[in-house]
């Protein structure tokens, strides 16, 4: 089965951070006689019909439109999407000569200067669970419990735990209402669930002078059926939490695992 080859590409339950996964080889297309759905992050619209003349803009819209055996063909560009479920046997591939990138990082549009050489996003950024650790006591994990990521001009910043520590090479997540535990020393006792959004990111460089990307997705793709093929797609910058049992109010338990192949 094609899914077996995908699994061999080491993307089962993979947490995708600074390193990237370049999917450059895949088995034959899901079906030679299926439809081709064209997608262009830069020149498409999800109001389009998926033809070459009117491509869709997102992979998510293409997956909804596709039927079993179809091919989703990606034009060059950056696709800022996540939590995508592949429930049909489709091929997702780069168009000829294209090098598409699927990333979980967004480029915030709203920043405010703090007057102290630091800049903050709005307070509507994604809240990641920082107590969802394999260790039942998250305090023993330290900074490793925090899955958040920020990139400036493509280079990762180092996360710190206070605004005072923010420099040009570090960032801080200001979360006034983080996910907490019912038992502070044992996350297996359950979580106090909080809204999906409500945090702010603080950096020490002027975002008007740089490209700043903040990871806002936990998982890239979930493969939920057989006969799925990928080709020519780079996948990068996803922030999966360590445990899979946190019920996020928007994305449920798929905050664990950067990319997942469900076994049949």
Enumerate the predicted regions with their spans.
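Secretory targeting and sorting signals
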Residues: 2-25
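Extracellular polysaccharide-degrading/modifying enzymes targeting complex plant/algal/animal polysaccharides
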Residues: 38-262
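Low-complexity, acidic Ser/Thr/Pro-rich repeat tracts that form intrinsically disordered stalk/linker regions
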Residues: 25-35
């Amino acid at each position: 089965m094609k899914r077996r080859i995908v699994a061999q590409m080491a993307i089962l339950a993979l947490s995708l951070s600074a390193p990237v996964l370049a999917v450059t080889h895949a088995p034959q297309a899901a079906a030679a006689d299926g439809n081709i759905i064209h997608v262009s992050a830069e020149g498409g619209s999800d109001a389009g019909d998926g033809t070459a003349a009117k491509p869709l803009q997102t992979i998510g819209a293409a997956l909804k439109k596709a039927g079993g055996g179809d091919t989703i063909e990606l034009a060059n560009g950056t696709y800022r999407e996540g939590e995508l479920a592949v429930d049909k046997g489709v091929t997702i591939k780069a168009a000829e000569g294209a090098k598409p990138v699927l990333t979980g990082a967004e480029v915030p549009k709203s920043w405010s200067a703090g007057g102290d050489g630091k800049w903050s996003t709005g307070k509507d950024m994604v809240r990641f669970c920082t107590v969802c650790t394999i260790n039942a006591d998250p305090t023993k994990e330290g900074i490793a419990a925090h899955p958040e990521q920020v990139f400036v001009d493509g280079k990762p910043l180092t996360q710190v735990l206070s605004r005072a520590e923010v420099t040009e090479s570090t960032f801080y997540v200001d979360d006034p209402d983080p996910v907490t535990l019912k038992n502070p020393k044992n996350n297996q006792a359950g979580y106090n669930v909080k809204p999906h959004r409500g945090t702010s990111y603080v950096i020490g460089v002027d975002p008007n002078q740089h490209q700043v990307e903040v990871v806002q997705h936990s998982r890239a793709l979930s493969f939920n059926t057989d006969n799925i093929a990928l080709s020519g797609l780079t996948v990068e910058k996803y922030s999966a939490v360590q445990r899979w049992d946190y019920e996020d109010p928007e994305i449920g338990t798929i905050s664990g695992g950067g990319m997942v192949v469900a076994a049949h």
